[in-house]
Swiss-Prot record:
May be involved in protection from oxidative damage. Residues 696-857 form the TLDc domain. The gene is oxr1. It comes from the Eukaryota. Residues 190-249 form the GRAM domain. InterPro entries: LysM_dom (IPR018392), LysM_dom_sf (IPR036779), TLDc_dom (IPR006571). Disulfide bonds: none annotated. One of its GO terms (cellular component) is nucleus. It comes from Xenopus laevis (African clawed frog). This is Oxidation resistance protein 1. The lineage of its organism: Eukaryota, Metazoa, Chordata, Craniata, Vertebrata. Belongs to the OXR1 family. Its main location: mitochondrion. Residues 43-74, 131-183, 300-353, 372-409, 421-450, 673-694 are annotated as: Disordered.
Length: 857
């Protein structure tokens, strides 16, 4: 140890030169001669301290000699490893991969220790070339959609950030070596895959948000665990993966062109807000008019005053948004307001409506009049806005009705001037409140001008009677006069309110009945215009992937995935809604990182790209692809095999068109016509198998229908009657005994007491088993009332289950699709997930009359 402390400056220079030769010349390596500092400190300390601190100095020397701090790459931030962190968990926190963290931090292994400083991708970093369609590392790695950025920000806010701070003593005395990072390595690594936040549009199972991962070898979609459909149905339904060599076509569309998939989606995402408002308005039916009037009346009485206001909103943005229209405001839409909306919809000006402010309380009549004057002044009638003039007339009638209330309040105040100051204040506040109620009723009233005049005359007569009564009792006791005045005023107000309410109900009912079709038509037109406007600024494009084999489920076992892949063998098209700015990234990725076709005989120079861009004039199969498909498609890349197939189909179609134009009959056309005729002649005979014994349950037509759905390995073999209740009796044990030695599918035919024919095809002979057995060839059928076949759905593998006392087909949810007891006498049929069937018989429980089992050998 003393030898280590006596290292001279010459040995330090030799060590530094050796390290410089080991590291590349383009990297700037700077060492601080820490050993000299340690030597000076040791000379100043006593020998005992040197001996006791030998282990600590050795550890410090190793740490200082190996300390490295890389220059932080662009788009990254510092993160300190915590006690329970691993490289995988850190990558999951920052929405990246462990391999990327290894590349960014130049790690030699995936092991991390608490307190270690790592560079992780910064979610708030915005690249200057992000808007470019070229494949930059940041644009490829980090999603650029607003939804993805919002999710990343929320995740980083929840996660505690710890800045690594070095000790001041070490920072002044030591200099760490700085290794400059090479951006070529990160670019070469990060450009090899795309990670896009998108939505998977399923066929009948909803739309799920998740991450689409595109690599040169695979395409995989992982759903978000926070999605409502994922929480309800589980990840097994939505996680899919496909090898890149199975992709035959990748196309980007403006809208979904698959008619079946488009019909299964309820409404476009951009039209949801508009349609919600329209559906809410359509709930106002003539049967609900009475409830509507009640709500209007209660709202008017609960509020102390009405403050008409003018709201200026844009038709294309806020008129039909859910945040602006509250349920109370929707219920207060009158026919005049609908007329205003319709008349102003043809012009470019904003819509101005008059509405009630129910939330304000205790506002006097002068404020209401001022607000009415403001609204009246702000509504300037134009040539096209004829509905606004009628609204101004309604305001004038409302003000005239309010003036009647003002005069009535004035006379009452003069007649009761002898009251005390306290009673006078109570009477004034009571009168002011009732004045506001009268004004509210008059403002809500939608009758004509004659009805308003009649209401004013009635109010004047009652006002005169009230004035006479108050003058006669003016010399009585002041408190008694106040109580009687309040009581009489209350009775008068209730009678007048009841009459006005009845008149208003009749008038409002007639007007809303007349204006309902017009209002619905207007709102539908506005919704369509809003939908068209938003369609221009749609933020999503639709990626259509066509594959040669169905995609595999990623969250199930390999056996289940293979079985489900076989069950969904007809599903060869998948749709994803991706952000529009990622369309160019996908296009460039498919062109650059496509799998190659290796031609061994021609060598390395004969390689062709795995995907080829399809041009407009190279589109074959015009009958299969509609004009709408070509119009909405932005771009499409196909595999080389698909490209050659389309070119051949296009050339064949052009040749046929030319022959048709020249009226030339080719040999293929003649052969196809002859083959069609022969097929029609021989079709009944080809589907009529040979039976070893005549069937007492199946007719000839029923046998032909069943033969069309049998597995291919049964075609051409004669039908052999293995078991029949007429010959062998009704015993399940006898059935199992007769099945021994068979190795073919078997057909079970049942006839119940209602003379209904149904049954099942089993992929294997019936036997006693501990669990379910069979394959996806198993299916159910029924002739009750019409012929129908129920194939395997792929949800589970509960095909056949044999016991000594029962025989069952299908399962899931505690119910069997078809069940027979040990005596083959009682049976039951129920819907199940295995086959997605309905009840095979007329009733759920049935009695077996006869059974036949046929084998194919």
């Amino acid at each position: 140890m003393d030898y280590l402390t006596d290292v001279t400056g010459r040995s330090s220079r030799v060590l530094r030169g050796t390290v410089n030769r080991l590291w590349y010349g383009h990297r700037q390596v700077r060492f601080q001669d820490c050993l000299q500092d340690v030597q000076r400190e040791n000379m100043a300390r006593p020998p005992q301290a040197l001996r006791s601190d030998t282990g600590q100095r050795k550890t410090l020397e190793k740490k200082d000699g190996r300390r490295m701090s890389f220059q932080r790459p662009k788009g990254t931030m510092e993160y300190t490893v915590e006690s329970r962190d691993s490289l995988n968990s850190i990558a999951l926190k920052f929405d990246t991969t462990p391999n990327e963290l290894v590349q960014l931090n130049k790690l030699f292994s995936r092991a991390v220790v608490p307190g270690q400083l790592l560079y992780v991708p910064d979610p708030d970093y915005i690249s200057s070339v992000e808007s470019s369609p070229s494949l930059s590392p940041i644009s490829l790695l980090s999603p650029t959609s607003s939804e993805a950025e919002f999710e990343k920000r929320t995740d980083t806010e929840r996660m505690p950030h710890k800045e690594s701070t070095s000790s001041p003593a070490y920072s002044t005395t030591r200099q760490s070596r700085v290794v400059s990072s090479t951006s070529e390595e990160e670019e070469a690594f990060t450009e090899k895959f795309l990670k896009i936040n998108c939505k998977y549009i399923t066929d009948g199972k909803g739309i799920v948000t998740g991450v689409l991962l595109v690599t040169p070898n695979n395409i995989m979609f992982d759903p978000h665990k926070n999605d409502l459909l994922v929480q309800e149905n589980g990840c097994e339904e939505y996680g899919i993966m496909c090898p890149m060599e199975e992709v035959t076509s990748a196309a980007m569309h403006k809208e979904i062109v698959n008619s079946k998939l488009k019909d299964s989606i309820p409404v476009d995402v951009d039209q949801l807000s508009c349609m919600r408002e329209f559906c809410h308005f359509k709930k106002i039916s003539p049967g609900n008019l009475h409830d509507l009037d009640s709500k209007m009346w209660d709202a008017g009485n609960d509020s102390a005053s009405t403050a008409p206001r003018s709201t200026e909103e844009s038709l294309s943005e806020d008129v039909f948004t859910e945040s602006e229209l509250s349920p109370i405001r929707e219920e207060h839409l009158s026919s005049d307001e609908l007329r205003q909306d319709k008349s102003s919809g043809t012009s470019s000006e904003s819509v101005q409506t008059i509405n009630q402010n129910i939330s304000e309380c205790s506002v006097n009549i002068s404020d209401c009049a001022d607000a009415s004057d403001d609204v009246k002044g702000s509504l300037e009638p134009s040539g096209n806005d004829s509905g606004i003039v009628s609204s101004i007339n309604d305001l004038e009638r409302s003000e005239s009705s309010m003036n009647v209330g003002d005069g009535l309040d004035k006379d009452i105040s003069e007649s009761s001037i002898v009251l005390t100051e306290a009673n006078e204040g109570q009477a004034e506040s009571k009168g002011s409140k009732n004045n506001c109620n009268d004004g509210n009723l008059a403002d809500n009233q939608t009758g004509d001008q004659n009805h308003s005049r009649e209401a004013a005359v009635v109010g004047n007569h009652r006002h005169e009677a009230l004035q006479e009564k108050t003058l006669k009792q003016s010399f009585g006791d002041s408190e008694t006069e106040a109580e009687e005045l309040r009581k009489f005023w209350k009775d008068l107000t209730m009678q007048q309110a009841k009459q006005q309410r009845e008149d208003m109900q009749h008038t409002t009912q007639k007007e809303i009945k007349g204006k309902m079709p017009t209002a619905e038509t207007h709102i539908e037109g506005v919704c369509s215009s809003v939908a068209k406007e938003k369609r221009r600024h749609r933020t999503h494009r639709y990626l259509c992937l066509r594959v040669g084999k169905p995609m595999r489920k990623t969250f199930v076992s390999q056996a289940s995935a293979s079985m489900q892949q076989y069950a969904q063998r007809d599903k060869l098209e998948y749709w994803f809604a991706v952000p529009h700015e990622r369309s160019d990234h996908l296009y460039s990725f498919f062109i650059q990182w496509s799998p190659d076709l290796y031609a061994e005989e021609l060598g390395e120079s004969a390689r062709e790209p795995g995907f080829v861009v399809v041009k407009k004039n190279e589109e074959g199969e015009s009958s299969d692809r509609s004009t709408n498909d070509s119009a909405s498609r932005l771009w499409e890349v196909v595999s080389v095999a698909e490209y050659h197939r389309r070119i051949d189909a296009l050339n064949t179609e052009e040749l046929r068109t030319l022959c048709r134009r020249l009226k030339i009959t080719t040999r293929e056309d003649v052969n196809s016509k002859q083959a069609t005729n022969i097929k029609h002649d021989q079709e009944p005979e080809s589907f009529r198998p040979n039976l070893s014994d005549p069937s007492s349950l199946l007719q000839t037509e029923q046998i032909e229908k069943l033969t069309k759905h049998l597995p291919p390995r049964t075609i051409g073999y004669p039908w052999t009657l293995v078991y029949s209740t007429a010959k062998h009796g009704m015993s399940l044990k006898t059935l199992y005994r007769l099945m021994l030695g068979l190795d073919t599918p078997v057909l079970l035919v049942i006839k119940d007491s209602d003379s209904q024919i149904f049954g099942a095809l089993a992929s294997e002979p019936f036997k006693v088993s501990d669990c379910f057995y069979g394959t996806g060839e198993t299916f159910l059928f029924t002739f009750c009332p019409d012929f129908e076949v129920f194939k395997w759905t792929g949800d589970n593998m509960f095909f056949i289950k044999g016991d000594m006392d029962s025989l069952a087909f299908g399962g899931g949810g505690g119910e069997f699709a078809l069940w027979l007891d040990g005596d083959s006498y009682h049976g039951r049929s129920h819907t199940c997930k295995t086959f997605g069937n309905s009840i095979l018989s007329k009733k759920e429980d049935f009695i077996v009359q006869d059974i036949e089992i046929w084998a194919f050998e």
